[in-house]
Amino acid sequence: MKKILSLVTIVALSSIAQADHHGEKATQPVGWTNLFDGKTLKGWTQKNGTATYVAKDGTIHGTTKKGSPNSFLCSDKEYGDFELQFDVKVDNALNSGVQLRSQTHGGKPDGRVNGPQCEIEATSGKGGGEGGYIYGEATGRGWLVPNDKRTPHKHFKDGEWNHYRIVCKGPRIQTWINGQLVCDLTDEAIYKSHPKGFLGLQVHGIGKNKGPFSVAWKNIKLKELK
């Protein structure tokens, strides 16, 4: 019995150590909320644009539409400090992202979506991509991560499902892709203007002679932090 218990302890400690080695701590199910039921878009509302969003095969599937500006499928609930995890797969030619603590201009339902956005993009044909870095969508600031800290990387696997982990705590936003830490940003200004808000799944606008392209999300879950 002692040998069995010792073996179980070793395996458990090994799993935790491996998670830490990849830049993430082992997560616990307590406190987590699934934001997508796998069948419907209940709890989500589209803002801006005319891209299409459907619940399909256990995913939220977004498809571009010619002539449409950026489109966002937004959570009906707002969040302040939280940890968000999801899996995403995107066409190599499409840029996407997830809005964090976002708002609409003037608080109007049809106002322009704005706020910090975690970038989603493939690395195909490049020396690396900028997925995981934080952009100031419609804030007038462009990238919130300084140029000298926005190093292209290949943590994103083109054409495959990629796991994102995002932690927003006060003015600090941290992101991981497939267990690799990508971004550790502290931005007091964006936190002052956007201390809480909705999440948004972006389908980026495309040129008239391009597409259609698609992006899909699944296993979307969130834990509010205190």
Question: Where does each model-flagged region fall?
Answer:
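Carbohydrate-interacting regions of secretory-pathway proteins
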Residues: Q18-K226
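Sec-dependent N-terminal signal peptides
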Residues: I4-L13
